[in-house]
Amino acid sequence: MGMTITEKIIAAHAGRDYVEPGELVTVKVDLAIANDITAPLAIKQLEKYGIDKVHDPNKIALVMDHFFPPKDIMSAQQIKISRDFAKKMGIKNYFEGQDSGVMHTLLPEKGFVVPGDLVIGADSHTCTYGGIGAFSTGVGSTDIAYIWATGETWLRVPESMKFVFYNKPQKWVGGKDFVLTVIGKIGVDGALYKAMEYQGEAIRALDIDNRLTIANMAIEAGGKSGIIEPDEKTVDWVRKRTNREFKLYKSDPDAKYCCEYEFDASKIEPVVACPSLPSNVKPVSEVAGTHIDQVFIGSCTNGRLSDLRIAAAILKSKKVHPEVRCIVIPASDQIYKQALHEGIIEILADAGCLISTSTCGPCLGGHMGILAEGEVCLSTSNRNFVGRMGHPKSQVYLSSPAVAAASAVLGRIAHPDEVAKYEEVETLITL
């Protein structure tokens, strides 16, 4: 029996030739990561047991992104604890402020993750790195502390689900629409502890930004991980960012999947996830006209350069609706600088967008865009649970950057066709 890409990566890191779903294995970890919320908890565990050194400081990365810049005394203290720990342990991969960003955008951008890696993070959206062919998943702070101390962890080998997208997608449709369509189909618990593997010509046609978006939201279906087989696009993208050696893994033709789904990409419309679950997915056409108070374009899901390009292409020479605050947060300093260089920031600012330094910010209801009672936000982030972005009686819809930008102009949920001609902005859109 053959193995899936996920099983092959786990087997390699377990020192095994073969693994199968359900097995408990101990694996070596290539990178163990945490943020300003989860790192202090892990540090506390190490201190509790008198552990005064880490296994390998070069295989640890700490990124201050959730409440950065510090929004209050407590968040400032959390960051200080993390900073002091990094200095004490000789951890050079510590990111705060300058040349930093949102963790799951920053780390692959800087070449810290390559295809075939096994990455564990104290953050649920660690699954993002599957977009470049790594096995990555989230754990709690106690598990991260153990990895920091030993360099390894245990896993139960997950079953794999296969999602095949074929045919050419419609205009305006990209990775966010694909993954929301999947979650709408299987539900928020439809992939519990499963590896969600994406295949097909429509997936291969996507750029890396869109692939990372798809992998990012595996956890919204309960998935252990999301993964896309690396190809020439992946290799080119990674090679521009690191000289690290890596191995490309692919699923065997006779690999076993617990279930398989097929989607005709040509029939998928731009979609939104309605309150208050990522699985409450409907075509934009069914909810067009819904009033909004805020638009958020950013996060580890859709704050990359291609996302800002499409938002700027739609908003160029237009104005954000006067009753809407449109918050745009580039997901890394590098993305911000490139957007500045390309004139994207100027276009967004002229349109009336509020542009922030890189932070998770409003995505988790942390700061810089909190919702009041009764307010409605259309967000390009990944979660829309009750109270996710503010007051329990606020509401959050999820969409692609294209839908978000169009909606910001009209002050209501809108299809991009209502405000822009696809042919005029197509050169800025890479799907």
Swiss-Prot record:
Name the Pfam families on file: Aconitase
Please give the biological process terms from Gene Ontology that the record holds: L-leucine biosynthetic process
Binding, [4Fe-4S] cluster = C300, C360, C363
User: What cofactor does this one take?
Assistant: [4Fe-4S] cluster
| Pathway involvement of the protein, from the record | Amino-acid biosynthesis; L-leucine biosynthesis; L-leucine from 3-methyl-2-oxobutanoate: step 2/4
Q: Is 4Fe-4S tagged as a keyword?
A: yes
What is this protein called in UniProt? 3-isopropylmalate dehydratase large subunit
Q: Which organism is it from?
A: Sulfurihydrogenibium sp. (strain YO3AOP1)
